[in-house]
UniProtKB/Swiss-Prot annotation:
EC supergroup of this enzyme: transferase
Record protein name field: tRNA (guanine-N(7)-)-methyltransferase
EC number: 2.1.1.33
InterPro entries in the cross-refs: SAM-dependent_MTases_sf, tRNA_(Gua-N-7)_MeTrfase_Trmb, tRNA_methyltr_TrmB_bact
Higher taxonomy: Bacteria, Pseudomonadati, Campylobacterota, Epsilonproteobacteria, Campylobacterales
Pathway: tRNA modification; N(7)-methylguanine-tRNA biosynthesis
UniProtKB keywords: Methyltransferase, S-adenosyl-L-methionine, Transferase, tRNA processing
Binding site for S-adenosyl-L-methionine: E123, E148, D175
Keyword hit for Transcription regulation: no
Organism: Campylobacter jejuni subsp. jejuni serotype O:23/36 (strain 81-176)
UniProt keyword Transferase, yes or no: yes
Length: 392
């Protein structure tokens, strides 16, 4: 994560803007200050954290922009405008950093869903993009949707697509399980999962699980196919066992088959003479229906100034666990007379992190979390906890 350390920070008078970077407002607690930052169409927090002999300034990891160049530019402007005696820095705004909005990267699920049409392939964890770009070139009439949790991979592959004149891809930063949960039933032709982290010693951390397999079966078309390629026999066998729970699936199993394109990980494993396993699954024949999405309905909550004072005074770092969701109150910040809450919540295998702004009402600071049932339940619980736990 790009960052720098400064001995001194000048008085921060906001709003402040320069070179398409805007610092609009600040919220803080005893250890951390958050600056609401806008660069072109994206918003995120810069974080100022007290450290020994100075301050560390970096992007907040749960709101970081999809384009790393935006964060680098914001850090540069903040350093020049508000900092003295720079101790060290670990960022540099390069001329070729991806700053301009690219049509290949979508920022949220609403934007993604508006662009999905025709035949769709999904690649989960596309990494360097070799296989994703190969599929895009071989299937020009198919939309190749890549999902990846690491921002640098999105930026790198978007650049490669532009250079190689590949136009039928979309990339999104997300947990694959969350992505699948928002897609329409019977809407995807293929799902590729190539060389996932095997987690052989911690299988509970694998993306593969019963719920994931059910979601694959739901979103795949009648003749749609799931394709796993892995160097881990344990992962291969585990995945096979998960799909064997379906009534009449069909499988194709292969070992050490050479494909037309090879990822850098596959090249590495072949040099080490490791075995490579392929598992294809289709014929799920599962009756599925699209989820009906509810609303968060935050408009039903109102606060007085006295309520906000009580929330601030009584705030505790607490976690509530229910059967199918959790809610964790992580931090609280003061923004003038208003409050900022940082919370984690949702399904145990698909956690969300977000900030909520409290004044007379309560609102999500950035985009809304997607309206899956676990998130709806968690936010409803949050509204009750604010009343009961924090005594308003």
């Amino acid at each position: 994560m790009p960052n720098f350390k400064s001995k001194k920070i000048k008085e921060i008078n906001l709003p402040y803007s320069k070179d398409d970077v805007e610092f609009l407002w600040l919220a803080k607690n005893d250890n951390v200050s958050l600056i609401y930052t806008k660069v072109q169409e994206e918003s995120f927090f810069l974080q100022i954290k007290k450290a020994q002999n100075g301050f560390v300034i970096k992007g907040d990891k749960h709101t970081k922009p999809s384009k790393i160049g935006y964060l680098q530019k914001a850090l540069k402007i903040f350093k020049e405008g508000f900092c003295e005696d720079i101790i060290n820095e670990a960022f540099g705004l390069k001329n070729n950093a991806l700053i301009e909005k690219t049509p290949f990267i979508v920022d949220n699920f609403d934007e993604l869903l508006s662009k999905l049409q025709g035949k769709i392939y999904i690649e989960i964890g596309f990494g360097s993009g070799r296989h994703l770009l190969y599929q895009a070139k071989e299937n020009p009439n198919v939309l190749i949707l890549g999902v990846e949790i690491y921002n640098p991979a999105l930026t790198q592959v978007a650049k490669l697509a532009k250079v190689q004149n590949v136009n039928n891809i979309l990339l999104i930063q997300s947990d694959a399980r969350l992505l699948l949960s928002v897609l329409k039933s019977k809407s995807v032709e293929k799902i590729f999962l190539h060389f996932p982290v095997p987690w052989d010693k911690k299988p509970h951390r694998r993306v593969i699980g019963k719920d994931f397999c059910k979601e694959c079966a739901r979103v795949l078309t009648q003749n749609g196919r799931f394709e796993l390629r892995t160097d881990s026999f344990e992962y291969f066998n585990f995945t096979l066992e998960q799909f064997l729970t379906f009534p009449a699936p069909k499988f194709s199993l292969r070992k050490n088959e050479n494909l037309e394109i090879s990822s850098k990980y596959e090249d590495r494993w072949k040099k080490q003479e490791k075995n490579i396993y392929d598992l294809w699954v289709w014929n799920f024949n599962q009756e599925c229906k699209n989820y009906e999405l509810n609303e968060f309905n935050l408009s039903s909550v109102e606060f007085s100034k006295e309520d906000l004072k009580k929330i601030e005074q009584n705030f505790k770092n607490i976690t509530i666990k229910k059967d199918d969701f959790f809610l964790h109150f992580e931090s609280i910040y003061k923004q003038d007379e208003n409050l900022l809450l940082k919370v984690a919540f949702g399904a145990f295998n698909k956690p969300e992190h977000c900030y909520l702004h409290l004044d007379k009402t309560i609102d999500f600071v950035f985009k809304e979390p997607f309206k899956i049932q676990e998130n709806i339940k968690a936010i409803n619980e949050l509204k009750e906890i604010l009343k009961v736990q924090f005594k308003i």
